[in-house]
């Protein structure tokens, strides 16, 4: 999966002219309980910054919007600050902290550990994240 993401990103870079955007001026912001998602579109790619406050948990804050058993968005993300505890549907779990890069397939829950907001920059799975399911 990582090779696929890298190939896709390389293709986008090779086929486009230079473009610079800032997550500080997002194209779209989605707010949900104890968090928000800021999206920028660059070329054909979508990059999202997720900000999750203490007490945020996917299964209580986003699940009501997604209406799925667990998070079905795959993620390839850089952890900027805070700690996220991630539990995959198969029972695998891990704390991700500032400086970590995580690749998460579909089927997981996550929550903020401690009193510091967790911030991630995601290069793959945020295009449909926290959208109201129909």
Tell me what each language-model feature is:
Residues 5-51, 59:
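A short, N-terminal "cap"/entry segment at the start of jelly-roll beta-barrel domains
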Residues 57-58, 82-87, 110:
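Short beta-strand segments in beta-sandwich/barrel cores
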Residues 88-107:
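Short acidic-glycine-tyrosine-enriched beta hairpin
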Residues 49-70:
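Conserved short histidine dyad/triad with adjacent acidic residue
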Residues 105-130:
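Ligand-binding loop in jelly-roll beta-barrel domains
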Residues 68-86:
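Short, conserved beta-strand element in jelly-roll/cupin
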Residues 24, 54-56, 125-134:
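Glyoxalase I/VOC metalloenzyme domain signal
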């Amino acid at each position: 999966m990582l090779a696929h993401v890298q190939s896709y990103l390389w293709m986008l870079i090779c086929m486009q002219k230079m473009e610079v955007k800032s997550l500080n001026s997002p194209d779209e912001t989605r707010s949900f309980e104890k968090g928000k998602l800021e999206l920028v579109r660059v070329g054909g790619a979508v990059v999202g910054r997720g900000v999750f406050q203490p007490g945020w948990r996917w299964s209580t804050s986003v699940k009501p919007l997604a209406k799925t058993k667990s998070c079905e968005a795959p993620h390839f993300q850089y952890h900027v600050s805070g700690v996220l505890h991630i539990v995959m549907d198969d029972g695998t779990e891990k704390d991700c902290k500032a400086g970590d890069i995580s690749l998460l397939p579909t089927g997981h829950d996550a929550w903020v550990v401690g009193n510091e907001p967790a911030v991630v920059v995601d290069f793959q799975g945020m295009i449909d994240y926290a959208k109201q399911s129909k």
